[in-house]
């Protein structure tokens, strides 16, 4: 069975699950998962784990993400992105808003902030996904979540036309951030209805869009028995603290035994001869093998 990490460039119009389903058909294997869901309209980096690498995919979802996109001020939608129905309008012209005001407002969102996930999201409340409530017209109290915005800035001039204002942006954020909600909250701060009109994820789990491949490109490589699209499993633990093991430690780990290590981390990626062989978890003064990858 093939094993590794794929830096997939997801295209618009497909869910993250659709991408996994198509890769299973291309690679003729069922053991495939994704790290970090992308909405159907969002394009960009979707980390994929194949084979044994699926055992470390949970650690890929912990990392921060980088996005580039577009915010439109002037009207809001039911889904907070361009796919929803228009629910309110606040027309504006060039005399109503300056770039300095926008930049100042964007800067106020950096650091730890509280965010309420959108109704059209997969967050569960009482065992039911929020979008299921939304589709049936029900409004429920949504759990607040703590996120961190490392950087949020404008990357284009403000473009005004027919009562709306559009501009491009860059955001670096923690896992669990809803960028479309960030776009809506920015609009509220500026005093206008708004939504996220485009979004592209350019980096996730240490994978960059500059090296990502489309499904079509992966399919062509696989047909030619070119497996260069598969990155080593070690790419799945880039964000974990690492420790190099002795041969004696490796043997103990292979039997599922605990080992003594001087390390303050709660979770470690254990390496032997430059290969990740286990995920270790702290238990008192010892580390227990949580996942053995030998």
From Swiss-Prot:
It is an enzyme of class 5 (isomerase). GO terms for molecular function: RNA binding; tRNA pseudouridine(55) synthase activity. Its EC number is 5.4.99.25. It comes from the Bacteria. The active site is at 39 (nucleophile). Keywords: Isomerase, tRNA processing. One of its GO terms (biological process) is mRNA pseudouridine synthesis. InterPro entries: PsdUridine_synth_cat_dom_sf (IPR020103), PsdUridine_synth_N (IPR002501), tRNA_psdUridine_synth_TruB (IPR014780), TruB_C (IPR032819). It catalyses: uridine(55) in tRNA = pseudouridine(55) in tRNA. Responsible for synthesis of pseudouridine from uracil-55 in the psi GC loop of transfer RNAs. This is tRNA pseudouridine synthase B. The gene is truB.
